Amino acid sequence: MIAIIKFPGTTCETDVYKALIEAGVPTVIVKYKDFDPDRYNGVILPGGFSFGDYLRAGSIAASTETMKKVKQMAEDGKIVIGICNGFQILVESGLLKGALLPNLKLRFISKWVYLKVIRADTILTKGLDKKIIRMPIAHAEGRYYVDDIDYAKTHMVLQYCDENGNISEDVNPNGSLLNIASIANEEGNVIGMMPHPERASFKLTSIDGTVDGLILLRRLGEWA
């Protein structure tokens, strides 16, 4: 069972829930104060504006007792995935290295993007090496940065690219270091991503009927 943790200000929990059900993954939405890590094989921290994004995006949620429990789950090898604001929570809590800074042009960005799978050894991307997928982003603080370039190169999972998989500054929507859209820990069980797979999981609501989000989410089935 995968727990979708809802903090005050989380807004995407229902979309993630419906997408996981569509992907055949057993899941439940859990309020952060009610979270019991012993009941779940993994967690997803969905998008939104946890605790109003006061101080910094994700910083207050990162300091909760709930995230201490999530950290222990990660250390135990269980799945921890952060989407958008969830990714911000993961870096603020130290589960992933780096920071998510305001977009380079200081504007909220909402658009569909192409992504190249760089690491095919994570829970979500096994067997997808160099595959090009398409999902939407929607954020104001999604510019990934880390002061360790070697870490960035070895831990990035997805990079922003064009439809042919070419990676350049021209297709970097927010100024992220090395066009990074997603990173994971060395073990591949803790993954943070700015794109929203849940918004690319239904033909009716996806651009051109794209359901590439399901390609990633279905891989959670063997763990749930």
UniProtKB/Swiss-Prot annotation:
Catalysis: reaction(s): N(2)-formyl-N(1)-(5-phospho-beta-D-ribosyl)glycinamide + L-glutamine + ATP + H2O = 2-formamido-N(1)-(5-O-phospho-beta-D-ribosyl)acetamidine + L-glutamate + ADP + phosphate + H(+); L-glutamine + H2O = L-glutamate + NH4(+)
Task: Kindly give the InterPro entries that the UniProt entry links to this protein.
Answer: Class_I_gatase-like, PRibForGlyAmidine_synth_PurQ
Pfam families, per the entry: GATase_5
Q: Where does this polypeptide localize?
A: Cytoplasm
Q: What are the Glutamine amidotransferase type-1 domain coordinates in residue numbering?
A: 1-224
Question: Per its UniProt record, what PROSITE patterns does this chain match?
Answer: GATASE_TYPE_1
Q: What keyword terms does UniProt attach to this protein?
A: ATP-binding, Cytoplasm, Glutamine amidotransferase, Hydrolase, Ligase, Nucleotide-binding, Purine biosynthesis
What superkingdom heads the lineage?
Answer: Archaea
Record-level Gene Ontology MF annotations: ATP binding; glutaminase activity; phosphoribosylformylglycinamidine synthase activity
Q: Alphabetically, which GO biological process terms does the record hold?
A: 'de novo' IMP biosynthetic process
Q: What are the record's GO terms for cellular component? A: cytoplasm
Q: Which residues form the active site?
A: 84, 196, 198
Pathway(s) of this molecule = Purine metabolism; IMP biosynthesis via de novo pathway; 5-amino-1-(5-phospho-D-ribosyl)imidazole from N(2)-formyl-N(1)-(5-phospho-D-ribosyl)glycinamide: step 1/2
User: Self-association or partners: how does it assemble?
Assistant: Part of the FGAM synthase complex composed of 1 PurL, 1 PurQ and 2 PurS subunits.
Tell me the PANTHER family matching this sequence: PHOSPHORIBOSYLFORMYLGLYCINAMIDINE SYNTHASE SUBUNIT PURQ (PTHR47552:SF1)
Q: What does this protein do?
A: Part of the phosphoribosylformylglycinamidine synthase complex involved in the purines biosynthetic pathway. Catalyzes the ATP-dependent conversion of formylglycinamide ribonucleotide (FGAR) and glutamine to yield formylglycinamidine ribonucleotide (FGAM) and glutamate. The FGAM synthase complex is composed of three subunits. PurQ produces an ammonia molecule by converting glutamine to glutamate. PurL transfers the ammonia molecule to FGAR to form FGAM in an ATP-dependent manner.
Could you identify this protein by its name?
Phosphoribosylformylglycinamidine synthase subunit PurQ
Q: What is the organism lineage in this UniProt record?
A: Archaea, Thermoproteota, Thermoprotei, Sulfolobales, Sulfolobaceae
